[in-house]
Amino acid sequence: MAQGKQKFKAQRPGGAKKHQNKPKGLKKGGRIIAPKKAQVVQQQKLKKGLEVAIRNKIEHEVTQKASTSLHKKLSVLKTPAQKSGTAGAPKPAAGPSK
């Protein structure tokens, strides 16, 4: 017989199967990796602010052009921001179903 202790312990069959992780599918949506440098964070804030400002300006110009082309005044309605607790659109009134 060989001297010294055994190199490997005896393993139970199926013991390794418990720890297997199945690969999960990809999640939807874009992913943004948070930067670690303060300068990059500042650049991203500036970029986002500029994008919002440009989008708002374009929307304003479009509404101005649309209101001048119509014979009556165009009113733009904005929906109030919803709380995070109330997700989704309000449910319609329940009517008699057949």
UniProtKB/Swiss-Prot annotation:
Coiled coil: none annotated. Residues 1-38, 63-98 are annotated as: Disordered. It holds the Pfam family DUF2462. It comes from the Eukaryota. Residues 83-98 have a biased composition (Low complexity). Residues 1-30 have a biased composition (Basic residues). Belongs to the UPF0390 family. This is UPF0390 protein zgc136864. It comes from Danio rerio (Zebrafish).
